[in-house]
From Swiss-Prot:
<keyword id="KW-0378">Hydrolase</keyword>
<keyword id="KW-0547">Nucleotide-binding</keyword>
<comment type="pathway">
    <text>Cofactor biosynthesis; 7,8-dihydroneopterin triphosphate biosynthesis; 7,8-dihydroneopterin triphosphate from GTP: step 1/1.</text>
</comment>
<dbReference type="InterPro" id="IPR020602">
    <property type="entry name" value="GTP_CycHdrlase_I_dom"/>
</dbReference>
<keyword id="KW-0862">Zinc</keyword>
<comment type="similarity">
    <text>Belongs to the GTP cyclohydrolase I family.</text>
</comment>
<dbReference type="GO" id="GO:0003934">
    <property type="term" value="F:GTP cyclohydrolase I activity"/>
</dbReference>
<dbReference type="GO" id="GO:0005737">
    <property type="term" value="C:cytoplasm"/>
</dbReference>
<dbReference type="GO" id="GO:0008270">
    <property type="term" value="F:zinc ion binding"/>
</dbReference>
<feature type="binding site">
    <location>
        <position position="75"/>
    </location>
    <ligand>
        <name>Zn(2+)</name>
    </ligand>
</feature>
<dbReference type="InterPro" id="IPR043134">
    <property type="entry name" value="GTP-CH-I_N"/>
</dbReference>
<protein>
    <recommendedName>
        <fullName>GTP cyclohydrolase 1</fullName>
        <ecNumber>3.5.4.16</ecNumber>
    </recommendedName>
</protein>
<dbReference type="GO" id="GO:0046654">
    <property type="term" value="P:tetrahydrofolate biosynthetic process"/>
</dbReference>
<keyword id="KW-0342">GTP-binding</keyword>
<dbReference type="GO" id="GO:0006730">
    <property type="term" value="P:one-carbon metabolic process"/>
</dbReference>
<dbReference type="GO" id="GO:0006729">
    <property type="term" value="P:tetrahydrobiopterin biosynthetic process"/>
</dbReference>
<dbReference type="Pfam" id="PF01227">
    <property type="entry name" value="GTP_cyclohydroI"/>
</dbReference>
């Protein structure tokens, strides 16, 4: 037996008492392998290749916010999805970044096995690195299927995490402006 993800999925199906050769499951191991490769493709991406040449000189010195960026990731504890939205903001210091790159940074880290707390920090630090901003704020609000489908089985809970760097951490007014603008 080879050592592919599909081979291991087939073994899991057998361990569950399923027949991996029945019609509905015959192609499941390969489909799952392909899905998992997509859901974890962030491991093969690096910040410079995601941002490319989309950081530009600018005199803009007011807050830039991109809110409601959809995200999904896999919980590293149970390999079950968590799904939510991410709000990012930065205070430029002579440079701005193409807005699609903010969403791509979110995806690069979300498409890995994650916990939401680390994901939030990784996104904030990457935006700070890419933009050299005066400060960065990131908030993620997500529902975790590992908590909804198993364990405590709480269907309506939503986890919120935030990371504030630079002026977003040091200046209450900057942080308050960010929080008020994402709630509009």
């Amino acid at each position: 037996m080879s050592n592919t993800i599909a081979d291991h999925v087939k073994a899991i199906l057998i361990a569950l008492g399923e027949d991996p050769n029945r019609e509905g499951l015959r192609d499941t191991p390969k489909r799952y392998e392909k899905a998992l490769e997509h859901l974890t493709k962030g491991y093969h991406e690096k910040l410079p290749s995601v941002v490319k040449k989309a950081v530009f000189q600018s005199g803009m010195d007011e807050m830039v916010i991109l809110k409601d960026i959809e995200l999904y990731s896999l919980c590293e504890h149970h390999l079950l999805p968590f799904i939510g939205r991410c709000h990012v903001a930065y205070l430029p210091s002579g440079k701005i970044i193409g807005i699609s790159k903010l969403a791509r940074i979110v995806d690069m880290f979300a498409k890995r096995l994650q916990v939401q707390e680390n994901l939030t920090k990784q996104i904030a630090e990457a935006i700070l690195t890419a933009t050299e901003a005066k400060g960065v704020g990131v908030i993620i609000e997500a529902k975790h299927l590992c908590m909804m489908m198993r364990g405590v089985e709480k269907q309506n809970s939503e986890m919120t995490t935030s990371v504030m760097l630079g002026t977003f951490r040091k200046d209450d007014r900057t942080r308050s402006e960010f929080l008020s603008l994402i709630r509009k």
